[in-house]
From Swiss-Prot:
Family label: Belongs to the FKBP-type PPIase family. Tig subfamily.
Entry keywords, A to Z: Cell cycle, Cell division, Chaperone, Cytoplasm, Isomerase, Rotamase
HAMAP family: Trigger_factor_Tig
Protein name per its UniProtKB record: Trigger factor
Record has ATP-binding as a keyword: no
SUPFAM superfamilies: FKBP-like (SSF54534), Triger factor/SurA peptide-binding domain-like (SSF109998), Trigger factor ribosome-binding domain (SSF102735)
Enzyme Commission no: 5.2.1.8
One GO term of the biological process aspect: 'de novo' cotranslational protein folding
Function as written in the Swiss-Prot or TrEMBL entry: Involved in protein export. Acts as a chaperone by maintaining the newly synthesized protein in an open conformation. Functions as a peptidyl-prolyl cis-trans isomerase.
UniProt GO molecular function: peptidyl-prolyl cis-trans isomerase activity; protein folding chaperone; ribosome binding
PANTHER family tied to this protein: TRIGGER FACTOR CHAPERONE AND PEPTIDYL-PROLYL CIS/TRANS ISOMERASE, TRIGGER FACTOR-LIKE PROTEIN TIG, CHLOROPLASTIC
Protein's cellular compartments: Cytoplasm
């Protein structure tokens, strides 16, 4: 049986559960008899092992099973009778004081789900991101595609695209191959020496002083110059120090970017090389990417608004569970990138804020969906998968990938559900359009 529910905190509750010892003993004996039918022991036939031996071997385990079952049943009945929605799992502890003779007592401490009160959606303020894909953005994207297809040719040597001109010195946009050695106070340092090292001048891969020391050299020439490492340089051993570098230029290659012609269009998948079709294809891909990013920004604004108008306490146990899930996800992601995660600390507090937001939003979304019947419809899920498939070479394989696995389809359903909530809120809230520059939306990726 269980006592009345005690309120320990806003969401924390406690129930005391008592179980008669005689009831436990009766059930233990019953289960031992069942177990004895199949127990084997040296010198005895199956099912003929003395009950005393069976009890010695399995008694402790079965007693724990019986107690867990009795306490679990009483806990479930008590929470059901009191209409409590339990968050996470209860903490069960034996109670040793003020216990009647012939009974066992346990305290079950747990948290309950809060009453979710979503505020007035009409008072919510949401920013809807607006971005225009103009001809200038299409031109920038085509330039990026050209740079991705650049070919390098040795300066001074004839190629199908010329010899790079009469200037045989290294300049910005050239790819150079060098030998270099760096010293600090006359001593070489780790990472300060290499042979046959290639990089493109002007891309910013090397420190500006290093690139400046390379520009203007011809093949075979050497140069010695000082270089000051920034205080925040990633190499702690040299950060903030001044080194002396000697470089020898081994090779200079000039960059040839393809012309925007039929061959270039074909390299982008336009079979007949039609440039108008190419631009239309680039525009379509850009608009798809912009649409996805705009939706993501607008969704974030909607979620922020929902959090702002909805005040309630979040069960700590759910935050802890989500924190652990985020930690494990981060650990797996870093391991897949080849990092040795066993030596890295993962303080839970790094993930707590994000975990609380995710749990809070999950509770809010569930309430909005339930209150307004915004569940994902099968036709919506199908349309979303088909939209995903458009971005791939073989759409049928993408469709098969999702529809052959219920868990993958559940991920799509969750996205559709979120979109339903976003659209519903946009129809109720105070929505202000916010124009955003293309480059800002794309994180300056359009600059190449």
């Amino acid at each position: 049986m269980a006592t009345a529910v005690e309120t320990l905190d806003k969401l924390e509750r406690r129930i005391t559960i008592t179980v008669p010892v005689a009831e436990v003993q009766t059930e233990v004996e019953k289960r031992l008899k069942v177990r004895a039918r199949t127990v084997k022991a040296p010198g005895f036939r199956a099912g003929k092992v003395p009950m005393k031996m069976v009890a010695q071997q399995y008694g402790y385990q079965i007693e724990n099973e019986v107690l867990n079952d009795k306490v679990g049943q009483a806990f479930g009945e008590a929470t059901s009778e009191n209409k409590l929605r339990v968050a996470g799992y209860p903490k069960i502890e034996a109670k040793n004081d003020d216990v009647a003779e012939g009974t066992l007592a346990f305290n079950a401490t747990f948290e309950i789900y809060p009453e979710i009160k979503v505020g007035d959606l009409a008072s919510a303020e949401v920013e809807k991101t607006i971005v225009e894909v103009s001809d200038a953005e299409i031109d920038k994207t085509i330039d990026i595609l050209r740079k991705q297809r650049v070919h390098y040719h040795v300066k001074g040597e004839q190629s199908a695209h010329g010899d790079g001109g009469s200037d045989l010195t290294a300049k910005n946009s050239d790819r150079v191959t060098i030998d270099f050695v760096g010293t600090i106070n006359g001593v070489e340092f780790q990472g300060g020496k290499a042979e046959g090292y290639a990089f493109v001048l002007g891309e910013g891969r090397m420190l500006a002083e290093f690139e400046a020391g390379t520009i203007g050299l011809k093949v075979g020439e050497s140069k010695t110059f000082p270089l000051s490492f920034p205080a925040d340089y990633h190499g702690a051993d040299v950060a903030g120090k001044t080194a002396e570098f000697t470089i020898t230029l081994k090779q200079i290659e000039w960059a040839h970017m393809p012309e925007v012609d039929a061959e270039f269009a074909k390299s982008l998948g336009i079979e007949d090389g039609d440039l108008e079709k190419m631009r239309a294809d680039v525009k379509q891909n850009l608009e798809r990417e912009v649409s996805n990013r705009v939706k993501a920004r607008t969704k974030d604004s909607v979620m922020d608004a929902l959090i702002k108008i909805s005040e309630f306490d979040v069960p700590k146990v759910l935050i802890d569970q989500e924190t652990q899930r985020l930690m494990e996800s981060t650990r797996q992601d870093m391991a897949q990138r080849g990092m040795k995660v066993s030596d890295l600390p993962f303080p839970p507090e790094l993930f707590t804020e994000q975990a609380e937001r995710r749990v809070r939003l999950g509770l809010i979304l569930a309430e909005v969906v339930k209150a307004n019947e915004l569940q994902a419809k099968p036709e919506q899920v199908k349309a979303q998968v088909e939209e995903f498939a458009q971005s791939y070479e073989d759409p049928t394989q993408v469709l098969k990938y999702y529809f052959s696995d219920r868990s993958r389809l559940a991920e799509v359903e969750a996205l559709v559900l979120e979109e339903n909530v976003v659209n519903y809120v946009l129809g109720k809230a105070k929505v202000a359009d916010k124009s955003v520059a293309f480059d800002e939306l794309m994180g300056n990726n359009a600059q190449g």
